[in-house]
Structures are given as structure tokens and as C-alpha cells.
Amino acid sequence: MTVNMAYIGIIGGSGLYDLMPESTKKVIETPFGNPSDAVEIGEVNGVEVAFLPRHGKKHTIPPHKVNYRANIWALHELGVERIIGLNAVGSLREDYKPGEIVIPDQYIDFTKRRDLTFYDGPQVYHISEADPFCPEMNSILYDTARNLKIPVHNSGTYITIEGPRFSTRAESKMFRQFADIIGMTLVPEVSLAGELALCYSVIASITDYDVWSTKPVDAREVMNIMKQNDHKVRDILFNALPLIKKERKCSCSLRLDNAKM
């Protein structure tokens, strides 16, 4: 039975815990196993939200081991209809600079061995992913960042690689031909949200130029810039959440219409 606790879910890193000084933990069991951690229900700027740390509270789950199906299902069980994913990404363009924010509008799946669907049979659905992100939330997140004077790009193609390793230089140069940013955690999170007719948008914070640049990607450097970006992401969320209404005027809720075979 669905327990209506929050209509907005946030999936991201542990740096967001201080947004909710008081929260209630919900341990959710799903048909797909355990989520990354307990879901924290709390209030952010007057809005009830459900927060789930994608890699676990202590960041012990690598990107290719995240149980994306359980995470999305758990939020859905709590009554969440809109999800904001928080992602650290590398830049594949010189004009998309470390420290800046991207609100992506397209993605490319370059993962290899993840559970990609809720519908493995006997029910079969083929959802459209022509426009995978919620236009309503994308617009709110972009406008909020602009109003806060945070450097932000309102479009971008996000390529998701399997991880946990970073790209080779040859791979990175290839990816530059058809994507703008690169990361390890968007897919299948975004398409699974679509399979449950949920709204989904991403705040992607650029931590580095990918290895196509002259300097190789360094995990420690990425973490340092991530910490610097945390306050920008928190500011965007704090100001954007009250603008995201429960009533959905987008078409995300219709994603399953005519999708069943």
C-alpha cells in the first residue's frame, strides 16, 4: 500500500543531509531488493521531500552496483511523483566549465550490465524516451539557478558510462562527438522513473574536464570540486522546491499510455 508522505523525491549524495535538520527514516522493502539506504522524510523550505542517498549514507555503493530499481520503487511507494537527481559529471566541452551547473535535456546510455526495466515480463511496456526529462521541472531548476546568479546551462546531452573507472582518452574523445557531459549514475534511474510515469530532472554539477583534456581525471580533485559545488546545489534546491507544485501540468504522467504491448 502506498504511504503518501512526500510528492518530491531527491536522489543524491550525503552532502544534502543538512538541508533537512529534522527527518524521519523509512525503511522500504521492494520486489527488487533493498534500496541504497533508508529514505529520509523531512521538510526543506516548507516542502515535504523524500531523500535517498544513491550510494548509501556512507558512500559505500559504487555506481555500477546501485540498485536503481529498488531506489525508484521505494520513492514511488512513498507517494513521490517528482524526482530530482543530483549528479557529479565531467565536461566534454570547453565552454561547460568545472563549477558550473547543467540541467540536461537528453541522454545516451553507454552502460553495459545494469537492470534497466521493471517490465521483464510477463508485462511488457515500451515507453518513449524521446524527451526523457520533465520540461516543467527543468524550467524551474534552470530559472532558479539563473536568478541565484549560478552559472548554469539549460540543455546538454549526458552520456552514462558503466564505471567505476573513468574513461580512456580515446573513449573520451569519441564521447565528445555526441555528448556534452559524462557521468555514471543517470541511467537507468531516469528511464525507470519514466516506467512509473514519474517526473524526473537532474541537477548536474561539473567537477572536471574529462580525460580528453590534457590533465587526467583525478578522484581526489573531483571530490574537492564536488564539495565546492554542494552549496550551489543546496541553494538551487532550497529555492526551487516551493515552486514545484503537486499538480502536474506536464505529460510525464502519461508515459505509460499506449506503451503496453
UniProtKB/Swiss-Prot annotation:
UniProt organism field: Thermoplasma acidophilum (strain ATCC 25905 / DSM 1728 / JCM 9062 / NBRC 15155 / AMRC-C165)
**Enzyme Commission number(s) from the entry:** 2.4.2.28
Catalysis: reaction(s): S-methyl-5'-thioadenosine + phosphate = 5-(methylsulfanyl)-alpha-D-ribose 1-phosphate + adenine
Known InterPro entries for this protein? Answer: MTAP, Nucleoside_phosphorylase_d, Nucleoside_phosphorylase_sf, Purine_phosphorylase-2_CS
Q: In which pathway does it act?
A: Amino-acid biosynthesis; L-methionine biosynthesis via salvage pathway; S-methyl-5-thio-alpha-D-ribose 1-phosphate from S-methyl-5'-thioadenosine (phosphorylase route): step 1/1
Stretch forming the signal peptide:
none
Where, in this chain's numbering, is substrate bound? M184, D208, Y209, D210
Q: What this chain does, per the record?
A: Catalyzes the reversible phosphorylation of S-methyl-5'-thioadenosine (MTA) to adenine and 5-methylthioribose-1-phosphate. Involved in the breakdown of MTA, a major by-product of polyamine biosynthesis. Responsible for the first step in the methionine salvage pathway after MTA has been generated from S-adenosylmethionine. Has broad substrate specificity with 6-aminopurine nucleosides as preferred substrates.
Q: Which GO terms describe its cellular component?
A: cytosol
**CDD domains for the chain:** MTAP_SsMTAPII_like_MTIP (cd09010)
Gene Ontology process terms (BP):
L-methionine salvage from methylthioadenosine; purine ribonucleoside salvage
The entry describes its oligomerization and partners as: Homohexamer. Dimer of a homotrimer.
Question: Does Phosphoprotein appear among the keywords?
Answer: no
Q: What is a single molecular function from GO for this protein?
A: S-methyl-5-thioadenosine phosphorylase activity
Ordered alphabetically, the record's keywords are: Glycosyltransferase, Purine salvage, Transferase
Which annotated residues bind phosphate? Answer: S14, R54, H55, T185
Which residue numbers mark the site Important for substrate specificity?
Answer: S167, A219
Query: Source organism's superkingdom?
Result: Archaea
**What's this protein's family per the entry?**
Belongs to the PNP/MTAP phosphorylase family. MTAP subfamily.
Q: Which named protein is this?
A: S-methyl-5'-thioadenosine phosphorylase
